[in-house]
């Protein structure tokens, strides 16, 4: 849910029948005074890919928000969905702390076909690119309808795609997809996939979840998987239909990863998955939650404390820690007491807590969230004469951008570009050659 201010106002007055949203956006909706009217008619809360949410602070933010809005819709049912849960009873505790939760284990379907790719050249002793396997991967692409080639990092994906393109003597339509690319380019690749126009896509975690392209019949994982669950999710992108067995190949990036890849295969066939839950209570998320609740209006601390303790993970959350979080929001805590700008909340004579200055509500909302992104800069083609600006390619980390000098080259979006200048937090580049690497 990313709406303009005007559209958001309309939404708050007329909530939709079905809302697809994120933990961050749900927390923002909770922070508005209109929250009671928005959620009073709520009947179902569905948390898809719940295993991915419960592994991080995003899960804490989501269930803190749910604990707050449930008072507006006491009869609402919560449903969690996942194909890779190690301990369903633990996840059920997040959904229904009172143990009133039905666990439905569906038939996992056909056993996936997974193997280590056999290559004529052995993997190197060091390195993490998997470039040695490109001849065999080209053959696999030629013999399958559509192949997804997963990498663990964006940099590895860029290097692999470039070398794959150079080896693509038959000019098969291939593309690259990752989170640092411009949204227009990602949409272009996704549209081409829907139309069945691509034979292969080199990608990262941007295509891990929620991708149901019927043409995909092979998944290749380059490098040892960091999680068994993540590998299963990626494998599930192939033959994603009720009666289809997923097919996947794993390519160790180097010889040290061979053992890890075989261990991952054993874990899959023995149905041994990674654990889901982080047991430590993130006090920073509690503080953020208190600030967002205050944006919606005054609250009684005991009420919010009791709401929080309805979450399974927080059932033993003690009042002392809660009060310290509240004190931090009111006075800045022991470290920031002398700085008035950190005195966000105030407690009234009747014990209620509210914003010290209602004008800071929007600022608090804008800074809400638990995703820690590194500072990035836009990468744009240098403007041509008569044009105000060139087209945007994607983003790079600021630390990388400031290390460049004019004339340096790098890969982004499958293109080799030459660094020209850094202006107004925009990296200006020019194409290195007339050859354009794209879908």
Short names for language-model regions:
Residues 181-203:
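Conserved helicase ATPase core of P-loop NTP-dependent helicases/translocases
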Residues 14-30, 195-209:
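Conserved two-lobed SF2 helicase motor
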Residues 209-223:
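A short beta-strand element within the Helicase C-terminal
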Residues 227-275:
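Conserved segment of the helicase C-terminal RecA-like domain
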């Amino acid at each position: 849910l990313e709406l303009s201010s005007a559209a958001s106002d309309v939404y708050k007055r007329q909530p939709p029948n079905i809302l697809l949203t994120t933990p961050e956006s749900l927390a923002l909706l909770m922070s508005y005074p209109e929250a009671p009217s928005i959620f009073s008619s709520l009947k179902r809360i569905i948390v898809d890919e719940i295993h991915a949410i419960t592994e991080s602070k995003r899960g804490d933010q989501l269930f803190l928000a749910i604990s707050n809005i449930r008072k507006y819709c006491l009869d609402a049912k919560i449903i969690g969905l996942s194909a890779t849960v190690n301990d369903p009873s633990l996840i059920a505790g997040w959904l229904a702390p009172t143990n009133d939760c039905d666990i439905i284990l569906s038939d996992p379907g056909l056993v996936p076909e997974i193997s280590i790719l056999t290559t004529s050249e052995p993997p190197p002793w060091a390195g993490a690119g998997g470039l040695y396997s490109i001849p065999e991967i080209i053959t696999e692409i030629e013999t399958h309808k559509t192949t997804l080639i997963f990498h663990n990092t964006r940099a590895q994906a860029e290097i692999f795609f470039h070398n794959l393109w150079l080896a693509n003597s038959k000019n098969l339509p291939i593309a690259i997809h990752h989170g640092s690319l411009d949204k227009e380019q990602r949409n272009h690749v996704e549209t081409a996939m829907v139309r069945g126009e691509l034979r292969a896509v080199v990608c990262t975690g941007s295509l891990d979840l929620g991708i149901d392209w019927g043409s995909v019949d092979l998944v290749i994982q380059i490098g040892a998987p960091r999680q068994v669950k993540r590998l299963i999710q990626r494998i599930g992108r192939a033959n994603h239909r009720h009666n289809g067995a997923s097919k996947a190949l794993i390519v160790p990036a180097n010889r040290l990863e061979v053992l890890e890849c075989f261990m991952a295969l054993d874990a899959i066939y023995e149905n041994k998955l990674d654990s889901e839950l982080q047991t430590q209570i993130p006090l920073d998320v509690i503080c953020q939650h208190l600030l967002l609740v205050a944006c919606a209006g005054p609250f009684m601390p005991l009420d919010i404390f009791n709401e929080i303790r309805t979450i399974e993970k927080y059932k033993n959350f003690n009042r002392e820690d809660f009060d310290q979080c509240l004190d931090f929001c009111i006075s800045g805590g022991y470290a920031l007491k002398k700085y008035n700008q950190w005195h966000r909340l105030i407690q009234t004579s009747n014990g209620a807590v509210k914003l010290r200055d209602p004008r800071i509500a929007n600022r608090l909302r804008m800074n809400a969230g638990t995703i820690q992104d590194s500072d990035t800069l836009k990468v744009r083609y240098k403007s041509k004469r008569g044009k105000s600006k060139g087209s945007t390619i994607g983003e790079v980390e600021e630390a990388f951008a400031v290390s460049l000098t004019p004339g340096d080259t790098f890969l982004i979006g499958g293109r080799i570009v030459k660094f020209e200048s850094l202006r107004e937090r925009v990296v200006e580049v020019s194409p290195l050659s007339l050859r354009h690497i794209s879908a």
